[in-house]
Amino acid sequence: GPSGCDNTCGSTLENDECDICGGDGSDCSDVTLPIPIALGWNWFSINIEGDRSINNILSSLNATVDDFIKSQSSSAIYYGEEGWQGALTELSVTGMYMLKSANPDNLVISGSPVDPLVAPIALSEGWNWIGYTPQNDGPINDALASITATANDFIKSPTGASIYYGEESGWQGALSTLTPGEGYMLKVAIASDLIYPNFGPDDALVRIQEQNELPSSI
């Protein structure tokens, strides 16, 4: 009788477009990360594998001469036809970048999704400019569960911040969800590795519903 890709008689398994026997096509499928760029300073990160050279990553921008990008340790300037030049030559998935743009724009990056479990972010004592590697939103307490947090550790985005209040209270503040494409500043007292979980599409929603259904204290 007929056999599938697993060479079992009667099997109907077929290779998906990634050549995975019985796969669902998710292992090789490209994803696209659109990042809206505002006039002035923008904090962003990338969660996509591939050519990380600065001129490739930023190729979708309609950049203007003297537009500026910096990481925590280096920077580059846009020179027009010569492209982006400076000590910052490659963008990492683990870092946050600040981009100063003379015009509103859209940064669009495509490629294969990063696996957060194999992209640890080494946190140093003090301030760290961190990226966000998962493909979906993550509730802050789940997202930062891997680090050695201590009271008064602090995380901020351009629009909100949260403080760590200890094991029972966790992270609390206006910054309650971490989001793909966004970057953050994280201040920690103890160096450790930040390894984000692989969040599903609904993980942040489920967590919000759980919080809403908690009985109120009497």
Language model: regions and residue ranges:
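Extracellular calcium-associated, cysteine-rich motifs in secreted modular proteins
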Residues: 1-30
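N-terminal exported-region signature
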Residues: 30-218
